[in-house]
């Protein structure tokens, strides 16, 4: 059985000129870099990002690359941190299945440790749609859908307190 973890992982976006105006200087974003826009990708962007590398290439007037120029000025990219989540796969599959065809959210946590074992928001969206450019009609559909599939009800929803199950 599969889970999509849509609202947990979140999605990535491409850095725009507007984003650069407000971006933290210490992360050194450049136009067309990729950044975490929502979910864990956004919250832990500062850890996951890593650092860009660069190297100078000698390219002639015909566009032919003749290799690296000034190897001592080369900087290798640095990988970002690895995160370990406390999500229980089987429980996550179950909560996503329970929410199928419903609008709502389920959060399963350990009250003693604060660990989140499952968290889902419905409706959601196909996370693979964010690989490559998103067709404008799909983006508009998501943003005009009255069920708000991009909205993470578990994190961003404001609800009055209700009864809780006490064990």
What is each residue range found by the language model?
Residues 110-117:
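Short, glycine-anchored, charge-dense loop/turn motifs used at functional sites
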Residues 82, 86, 113, 164:
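Ser/Thr-centric signal marking residues that sit
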């Amino acid at each position: 059985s599969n889970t999509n973890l849509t609202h947990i992982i979140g999605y990535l976006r491409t850095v725009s000129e507007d984003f650069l105006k407000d971006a933290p200087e210490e992360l050194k974003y450049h136009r067309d870099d990729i950044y975490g826009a929502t979910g864990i990708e956004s919250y832990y962007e500062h850890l996951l990002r890593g650092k860009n590398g660069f190297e100078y290439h000698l390219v002639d007037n015909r566009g032919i690359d003749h290799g690296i120029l000034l190897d001592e000025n080369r900087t290798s990219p640095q990988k970002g941190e690895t995160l370990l989540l406390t999500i229980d796969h089987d429980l996550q599959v179950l909560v996503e299945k329970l929410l199928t065809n419903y609008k709502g959210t389920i959060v399963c946590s350990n009250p003693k440790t604060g660990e989140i074992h499952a968290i889902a928001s419905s409706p959601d969206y196909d996370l693979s749609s964010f690989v490559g450019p998103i067709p404008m009609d799909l983006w508009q559909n998501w943003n005009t859908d009255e069920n708000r599939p991009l909205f993470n009800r578990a994190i961003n929803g404001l609800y009055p307190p209700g009864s809780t199950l006490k064990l």
